[in-house]
Amino acid sequence: MKILLLILIAYLLGSIQTGLWIGKVFFHTNLREHGSGNTGTTNTFRVLGKTAGTITFLVDMLKGTLAVLLPIWLGVTEVSPLIIGFFAIIGHVFPFFTGFKGGKAVATSAGVLLGFVPLYFVFLLLVFALTLYLTSMISFSSITAAVVGLITLATFPAIHFLLDGYDPIFSAVLIIIALVIIFRHTENIARIRNHRENLVPFGLNLTKQNPNK
């Protein structure tokens, strides 16, 4: 019963679309009608500005971290905290409160890793940051971090010091998380291939994207 309750809490926690509610309450703006139409961090930055975007990222990430920590705090040992965290990701992607149309799972997935394997989170964050500087694309940086996450599973003996929380479930959950992130960026991948992906106002833009062409 406790496990089912934790799953429900994690899903409902993930279902809170931070950017959407910040836009409606403080800016009287529906994110679904502006920019890419997505309710996640990137579109919030683009439409509502840095402050709203930063708050959205932190809250969305915290949803994943809290979901992972809940079973630990409550002493529930019958299920891996990663499983509970995964349901927060499901909630973020398919939110009950907004017609099952949510974000791309990047920030919430990062929060899950932060709560379960902090060093590994830092490693993938550095991968994300470096890729963002080189390409100026949040989408490509997110996809790259997901792919690197998959690659590191094959090299686990070499990076075991980053995965102090590793167990067999970790591999399964990480694979699913990575695939969800990649799948949710299908439209971005198409724009990248056509050199029309949206950019952040810094970095090298090595792939020469031009969203205005």
Curated annotation (Swiss-Prot):
Source organism's superkingdom? Bacteria
Where is this chain's protein located in or outside the cell?
Answer: Cell membrane
Write out the GO MF terms. acyl-phosphate glycerol-3-phosphate acyltransferase activity
Record-annotated membrane-spanning stretches? 3-23, 55-75, 80-100, 110-130, 142-162, 163-183
Its BP terms in the Gene Ontology are: phospholipid biosynthetic process
User: Could you tell me the EC number(s) of this protein?
Assistant: 2.3.1.275
Pathway entry: Lipid metabolism; phospholipid metabolism
| Pfam families reported for this sequence | G3P_acyltransf
Question: Taking the first listed entry, what is the main subcellular location of this protein, grouped into a coarse class?
Answer: membrane
The record's listing under InterPro entries reads: G3P_acylTferase_PlsY
Catalyzed reactions: an acyl phosphate + sn-glycerol 3-phosphate = a 1-acyl-sn-glycero-3-phosphate + phosphate
**What keywords are annotated for this sequence in UniProt?**
Cell membrane, Lipid biosynthesis, Lipid metabolism, Membrane, Phospholipid biosynthesis, Phospholipid metabolism, Transferase, Transmembrane, Transmembrane helix
- Topology term for the membrane: Multi-pass membrane protein
Instruction: Kindly state one GO CC term assigned in the UniProt record.
Output: plasma membrane
Protein family = Belongs to the PlsY family.
Q: What the protein does?
A: Catalyzes the transfer of an acyl group from acyl-phosphate (acyl-PO(4)) to glycerol-3-phosphate (G3P) to form lysophosphatidic acid (LPA). This enzyme utilizes acyl-phosphate as fatty acyl donor, but not acyl-CoA or acyl-ACP.
Subunit structure comment from the entry: Probably interacts with PlsX.
What name has this protein been given in UniProt?
A: Glycerol-3-phosphate acyltransferase
Q: Which organism does this sequence originate in?
A: Streptococcus thermophilus (strain ATCC BAA-250 / LMG 18311)
